[in-house]
């Protein structure tokens, strides 16, 4: 007896129809070889719909009727990616005026790969770089159970219901080698023909058309009503396996692609391939660039990957991108337009960026009205002026920039000039004997552009430090533009993560002078928010076009009690978000301060090296310059920030307002990075090699006191230390090192963390029963440990939860210790 014979007739027919319709859909969408007429497919589809409507309990998880969508959702749930969805580094091959490509960046990529493989000869797979939306598909026992967007690479949104409406995504995998679990990464996009049809419908219905297929695909996939998504005709192409259990385990990426096709996925047939060397790769890239207009989908380049998965593993990753792959972008699309004006934008750090205001022009799929001119040197080099006809490019197909001026089209004017009498005298126009045409010359209508001397926002002087390309407004937090941008950064998710306080609210608070400094955020109360809202509403009502309505957004919701306006929950949510963010991790707090050159990674390094805010505030510049990934320029910027009385006062004000950055164990002891031979070489105004610095240290009795007082030390050292500022610096260094924990103390942790955690490398895999991944990571890092994304021989512990995959298998193979969540907590206590 087969499976169907054991069922009742209705269940049997539902199974038969589901299998039939899925097979027919595969033939139509993937093989492009339908075996039945459309009318017959529609008849069978309607039969299945009727059976499922009358017997919903018999509906199968891979039923093709799910592709029509369902009732709207209230919102999208978050999905934590088991394996982060990383980005790729970009490489460009600019063309000269004869259309010849300069492939220097790709040859450099090939050389880096070869160096990483110790001279090995890699094969490469080249695929189209689709201009769509990256998603991840999770299948268990062959059935699609979850689909998620990329999000920030770590956390995305659950779009399973919408993805099930995409016709060429199999709801159940095909073939004989179906894995127990597989997570497929790929791109959702909209074909050019479907995009044109969608925009025609939008126009006919009086709705705004989409700017490009990518925007249409992204907007369609994130519809809360999956029935709308179903109408939009999205398409999917797979490009990688994130994790897999069972099934056919490939050894090469080209085998993965073939496996995708066997499982029922569509591939961009004819537009990908495997090549033996970089020369063949580049020839195929140029072929694809020529073929680009004919393709049924938008691409903005190709993706080049090392074919061997073992070689991919050997090469590994750098930062947030793999070393074994690169996005080889096509030359950006360009267009001509006219510069109508040039003004400046003021950034968070006071950076003054000249911006060209342009006649609207369609470039690279979007309408461009502004383009960056980068800085004064670039404006002068390109000689961009108001009225010029310019070539505009979307650099990297993202940021519009002015490439060059078409000087032949520059607007000119005739101006009178003095005329020589031939013997060295100048005649004025009244007595000139030459024709009038010779008494004038054609000169540009507009003068060369120069940055203003003062900030257009706060009228502070614009200054440019020697050696710096960027000019900056000197107003600091006195400048409204810098205040707003600084506060937006301070409250952002990666900084203080103040939930509920968005850019529009901060801009309103600053514009109305209700908030001037970081600490002012912690003094906000209901009356302040109410005043902000009322002023925003007043501005909205006075705006003829109604554009200001979005400024207050959800702030416009009010309840009325006893005839008096009362703020609704939005205000209380903002206050709750401010209150809950008062105890940030030290690294987040340092990043939030907006110190120039200090990003997330540098902030984390500072936290790991010093453990407390007070130590960071007092860290001498030579010590800072010794830290990993922190050079002289960054160290000087950090030291300068904390040397300013107003910045120290600002931090004190935050602490007084109740902000309390969390101290953490020192996982990067000073002895590991700031040996005396290193910080001595970084003393300002004293040039010495590390070998001579070590000798000087030994002559001084291996103590800072000796450096301060020993009169037998070399004359050049005694001359240096005799200066008052250097005497003070040595005293500061002595005090600082005395307060830092020793290497043994650091290993134990500043608050008693034992050696099993501090300095150890952990890898998290699977779903933990209590903690989210980022919570567990925060606990480990606060205890002085490090969290890595991949398992290697250097891994100390793997913490495994439910559905732990290949990382657990690799840990067992390498003999790495595996912990449960409970065992991790025991280790941390």
Swiss-Prot record:
Metal-binding found in the keyword field: yes
Protein residues bound to Zn(2+): 455, 458, 473, 479
Pfam families: BRCT, DNA_ligase_aden, DNA_ligase_OB, DNA_ligase_ZBD, HHH_2, Nlig-Ia
Cofactor: Mg(2+); Mn(2+)
Domain BRCT: 752-829
Binding site for NAD(+): 38-42, 87-88, 127, 150, 187, 305, 329
GO terms of molecular function: DNA ligase (NAD+) activity; metal ion binding
GO cellular component: cytosol
Enzyme superclass (EC): ligase
Location of the region described as Disordered in the Swiss-Prot/TrEMBL record: 534-564
Listed HAMAP family: DNA_ligase_A
Chain's role: DNA ligase that catalyzes the formation of phosphodiester linkages between 5'-phosphoryl and 3'-hydroxyl groups in double-stranded DNA using NAD as a coenzyme and as the energy source for the reaction. It is essential for DNA replication and repair of damaged DNA.
Family: Belongs to the NAD-dependent DNA ligase family. LigA subfamily.
The protein's name: DNA ligase
Record organism: Neisseria gonorrhoeae (strain ATCC 700825 / FA 1090)
Organism taxonomic ancestry: Bacteria, Pseudomonadati, Pseudomonadota, Betaproteobacteria, Neisseriales
Gene: ligA
